[in-house]
Structures are given as C-alpha cells and as structure tokens.
Amino acid sequence: MSKQKHSASSGRWLKEHFDDKYANEARKKGYRSRAYFKIEEIQTKDKLLKSGMTVVDLGAAPGGWSQYAAKIIGEEGQIIACDLLPMDPIAGVSFLQGDFRDEAVLDALLERIQPSMVDVVMSDMAPNIAGNNSVDQPRAMYLVELALDMCRQVLAPNGSFVVKVFQGEGFDQFVKEVRDMFKVVKIRKPDSSRARSREVFVVATGYKG
C-alpha cells in the first residue's frame, strides 16, 4: 500500500517537474510566458501564421502569443492585441487594455481593424477561476463565443482561428459552431499544456465568410 502511494506521489512530482521546464525555459529565453511554447507547437503543426499577416490576439497579456506571432509575421505584418491586464510593449503590436466583454472596448478594438482584413484571430482568454465548475465553465464558454463572434466581424475569407477552450458543458456545441464556419477544424493539446488541465485548443482554417 505504501509503495503504491509513493508511486502515485512520485508520478505527480515528476509531472509537475516536467511542466515546470516550460516556465523555466520561457524565463531563460526571455519569452513572456509558457504560452509561447503552445502557440509555437500549434504553428509547427498547422502553419497558421505567415509573413505580412494581420493578426488579432485576444487575452494577450503577458504577451507570449503576440511575441511569437510578431517574430513570424515580421515587420510587414501587424498584431492588434487586447487584454484586461497591462502588457509591456512588443514591437509591431498595437495593444489595447480593457475588458473584451465591454461594448466600448470592443468598439475601440474594431476601430483599429479593417473589416474582413484579418488573417488570424487568436484567443487565449480565460475567466478568473472561482473553483466552481458550474460557474467557471459557462464563463469560459462565453469568452470563446465572443472570440468566435470577432471572427464573424473581422476575419478575411479563408482566414484562421485558434482559441483556448476548456472541455466540459458547451464544448461540443461550440466545436460544431466552428465547423459550420470553417473548412478544417482540429483539436490540439500541446505538450506544454498541463496534462491535468481541461484546456485544449481549437484550430480552424479556411473561414467560409
């Protein structure tokens, strides 16, 4: 019995230690967060980002996704980022601080974007966790629905969408909605995403407009 307990706790410790390597690596390389590795892995598999693109980054702070995307799209591209929290400046990124759920913030964001001219909408938004799934999951699904609605307003034909989603109530219906709007939809769980987390990333390409 004690051996079994030891084995389970050792397994948890090893998993935490493995997870920490991403945070440590991010600090060592000057990346804004471990999220940098998530979008890097998605890009390696799905090739969403290309030089010269226009990208919207929702839930951007502290800037891991914007930092990576800016490197790929280069000086010819542009990123419009938004978050409730402040974010240190990144070259090539236009940042708007505010609550994306607020109509005034959404309007201010849309003013910076030409309709149907965005190539990729990225969303790493997550709600403040209350610790009660019956509260947390609807909040999380509300945010991903807002991100999908942003696609309807700004995404160019054949554009792409990548969004963090927590598996649970409303997940299957959301994926169905995305499939109705995009030609190809994949579910990704990057190695740098904690195994115990319910987060996955819906990666959609070929916006039908």
Curated annotation (Swiss-Prot):
Active site location: K164
GO CC, alphabetical: cytoplasm
Catalysed reaction, written as an equation: uridine(2552) in 23S rRNA + S-adenosyl-L-methionine = 2'-O-methyluridine(2552) in 23S rRNA + S-adenosyl-L-homocysteine + H(+)
Domain of life: Bacteria
EC number: 2.1.1.166
Cell compartments where the protein resides: Cytoplasm
Record keywords, A-Z: Cytoplasm, Methyltransferase, rRNA processing, S-adenosyl-L-methionine, Transferase
Record-listed S-adenosyl-L-methionine binding positions: G63, W65, D83, D99, D124
GO MF annotation terms: rRNA (uridine-2'-O-)-methyltransferase activity
Family per record: Belongs to the class I-like SAM-binding methyltransferase superfamily. RNA methyltransferase RlmE family.
Task performed by this protein: Specifically methylates the uridine in position 2552 of 23S rRNA at the 2'-O position of the ribose in the fully assembled 50S ribosomal subunit.
Name of the molecule in the record: Ribosomal RNA large subunit methyltransferase E
Organism for this UniProt entry: Vibrio campbellii (strain ATCC BAA-1116)
Gene field: rlmE
